[in-house]
Amino acid sequence: MKEAISALMEKLKTHSLTFKEVLTFIETYYQHQPTAFKNGEAYNEATQNQGSAKVFAFAQLNNLPAEDTLYLFAEHYQAVLATPDGTDHQNIRQFMQHGWPGVVLEGQALLAK
């Protein structure tokens, strides 16, 4: 798994993968359970923003640092970087501001297959 994650991160850092491809990678190894979570000042119900829930849970389970976690958002992270004063992609913006201390998953969003 460590090698697969390293290869994933290399591709993300060269902007070679989309967010959808990241989610497909995560879903290859984990089963998702809808989970509510808090991220900084943003609260997400179990029916909202589950792509972000998958990313945060995956990054936590694999002890990824905040910087690598942001790369998992692929083109959405790049869009936030391009528009620092924007209001879209609040989960990315909140994570950039609050980091891991701001993320609280209210359950186990991912289970290993």
Describe every region a protein language model picked out.
Residues 2-9, 108-113:
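Long, charge-rich, low-complexity intrinsically disordered regions
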Residues 40-90:
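Amphipathic protein-protein interaction modules
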